[in-house]
Each structure stands twice: as C-alpha cells, then as structure tokens.
Amino acid sequence: MKEILNALYHQKDLNDEEVKKLFTLIIHEKVSPVQLGTILCALKIKGESFKEISVAATTLLEHAPKPFDSGLDLIDNCGTGGDGLKTINVSTIAALIASSMGLSMAKHGSRSVSSHSGSADLLENLGVNIEMNPTQLENCFKQTHFGFLFAPLYHQSFKKSAPLRKELFTKTIFNCLGPLINPLRPKIQLLGVYDRSLCKTMALALKALGVKRAMVVNGGGTDEIVLHDITHACELKNSEILEYDLSAKDFDLPPYDLKELQIENAQESVQACLDILGNKGKDSHTMVVVANVASLLYLSHKAKDLKEGVSMTLEHLKTKAPYTHLQKIIRLSHA
C-alpha cells in the first residue's frame, strides 16, 4: 500500500499489478477509510488513465457473481451520472423502448446521487422489482429482452464505500467504473460520461475490456446524447476509435432547450416515462429519448444510420407497445 500511495503522491500512473492489488484490497475491505479517501483524491488529481480504469473494472468483475449466461451479445446504456442537471432519466426510458423493439438490454445501474431519479429509483417507482434474484432476472430477460442489474447486489465495495465517496464532494474513479462492471459483460454499449474529456479515455477502457461496439458520449454537459447542444462522441468500431460531434440535424430532429428536460422531483420522472412509452409525452422529452434509442439501434446493426434509427423508433412508439412491454417487465420481475 505504501508503494501505491507514494506513486500517486508523485502523480505516476499505477501499473496493472498495482491496480489489481489495490482493488482486491478494496473489495476485501483491507483499505482504511483514510487511505481510500487519499487514493481516490490522488487518482482524481493525477487523472485516471484508461489502463487504470480498465484493470480496476476487470478486477471488480472477477469478484462479481454472474447471474446467468444468455449466450447473446448484450447491450447496456448505463452512464456515469454525475452531471447534476436533474433531467428526466433518458437512458432508462431508452432501454425500455429498445428492449420492446427486440434489443437485448442488460441495464446496470443504481440509485441517484446527483439527479431526482437514477435508473433504480425510476424502475422501482414504476413498480419493477429492482432486486430480482438470478432466476427471476433470467426469466424476465428471456421473455422481455430486458434485465435490470442493481449494482449494490453485485459490487459490495461500491455500496460500502458510498458514504466515504459522498463526503469527498467530487467524482472519483468509481463514477467511471459503474458503467464498466455490468456482471453480464455486455458487448455493445452506449455510455454517457459527465465530462467531455472522459470520452476518449472511456472508449479506450471499453476496448481494453473486450467490448465489440460502443459509443461514449457527452452532450452539452450531460451524460446523454442531446438535441439542445452538440454531443461529442467517441465510437468504437472495428477495434478503432472514431471521434466526432453530433447535432440534432444528424438525427433529423429539431433542437430543444435543456430546461425542457429538467424536472422537479422523482414523480415527474415517472410520469414522463409513462407518457413517452404511451406515445403521449412532451415532444422535447420524447425526441431526446428517440435519439438515444436510435443510437442503440445503430450500434446493434438494426439501423444503417441514426436517421433510420429515429424513423424506426417513432413508428414503434405509435403502436404504444413500449407501455405494454413495461407492464410485462413489472409482472415478471415479481414472478
């Protein structure tokens, strides 16, 4: 531990062996709160490298139980959170719609820290059992193409370190790790980050972890694809990383103001979700979700480009099938 701390004090990147040792100690609660706080802050000040992030994620995954083996290339759109803008839960609504269109969505998430409604909060408020056992989870996934993996059930180190991390009043490597440690190891990811500077780093980490296809995005300061501003993207395709910007025009959608996405409380998030799934949501809410679903369709090779993905999603919403699909997920999650 002394060597690890000294390396960080001198702002040196940790090697693979040091990262693996550090996170193994964290998992087994062999790091004191003072040491952990110091390490997290030192990593933050130095700037976490993609190698440090990917090796830490690999170590955490090695200690996480895998609930079942689907045999499919699963998809996740878990983001880092932490943008603090208190918008509707775009990624969770997008995952529900995408799964109703046949995409195999394995959604990894937890409760909110900086918003009114994290993925776990929204799903729980909708009536979904967020703590499904492996049998329930597999059954729900097989019948609906949707499974929610509540992060604290699989990663105790996250749960136990949460109070300390909250007291640091800053984002840490744990924010970056959340989207990378889905126990079902998805091969396709749409990953939103709270800071544009993380896009390339996280794309490299996904590549190192063996993800086949991904897009890491930051849109106007949010960890989503947005229509109110430019979305910066790093796309992992054929083992290469392509870096570019997206605007509403790339989706053939009109722009909307960020304020139209912001909500006052968790109940507003629930109502926005139900309205969108039932094809009666506000245009500003629906269209940003549609842009994110379109990106999932594109990454999954179900749409040739983003504009086709938008058309497919809008047509699907007209059927109101996503609303019926949610009711099935709720029922099966409790079965």
Swiss-Prot record:
MF (Gene Ontology): anthranilate phosphoribosyltransferase activity; magnesium ion binding
EC numbers: 2.4.2.18
Record: residues binding anthranilate 1: 79
Native species: Helicobacter pylori (strain HPAG1)
HAMAP family hit by this protein: TrpD
Role noted for this protein: Catalyzes the transfer of the phosphoribosyl group of 5-phosphorylribose-1-pyrophosphate (PRPP) to anthranilate to yield N-(5'-phosphoribosyl)-anthranilate (PRA).
GO biological process per UniProt: L-tryptophan biosynthetic process
Swiss-Prot/TrEMBL cofactor(s): Mg(2+)
Keyword vocabulary terms for this entry: Amino-acid biosynthesis, Aromatic amino acid biosynthesis, Glycosyltransferase, Magnesium, Metal-binding, Transferase, Tryptophan biosynthesis
Annotated cofactor note: Binds 2 magnesium ions per monomer.
UniProt: 5-phospho-alpha-D-ribose 1-diphosphate binding residues: 79, 82-83, 87, 89-92, 107-115, 119
Binding site for anthranilate 2: 165
Pathway: Amino-acid biosynthesis; L-tryptophan biosynthesis; L-tryptophan from chorismate: step 2/5
Binding site for Mg(2+) 1: 91, 224
Top-rank EC class of the record's enzyme: transferase
PANTHER family recorded: ANTHRANILATE PHOSPHORIBOSYLTRANSFERASE
GO CC terms of this entry: cytosol
Family the entry assigns: Belongs to the anthranilate phosphoribosyltransferase family.
Residues engaged in binding Mg(2+) 2: 223-224
Protein's name according to its UniProt entry: Anthranilate phosphoribosyltransferase
Signal peptide: none
Complexes and interactors: Homodimer.
Stored SUPFAM superfamilies: Nucleoside phosphorylase/phosphoribosyltransferase catalytic domain, Nucleoside phosphorylase/phosphoribosyltransferase N-terminal domain
UniProt catalytic activity: N-(5-phospho-beta-D-ribosyl)anthranilate + diphosphate = 5-phospho-alpha-D-ribose 1-diphosphate + anthranilate
InterPro entries per record: Anthranilate_Pribosyl_Tfrase, Glycosyl_Trfase_fam3, Glycosyl_Trfase_fam3_N_dom, Glycosyl_Trfase_fam3_N_dom_sf, Nuc_phospho_transferase
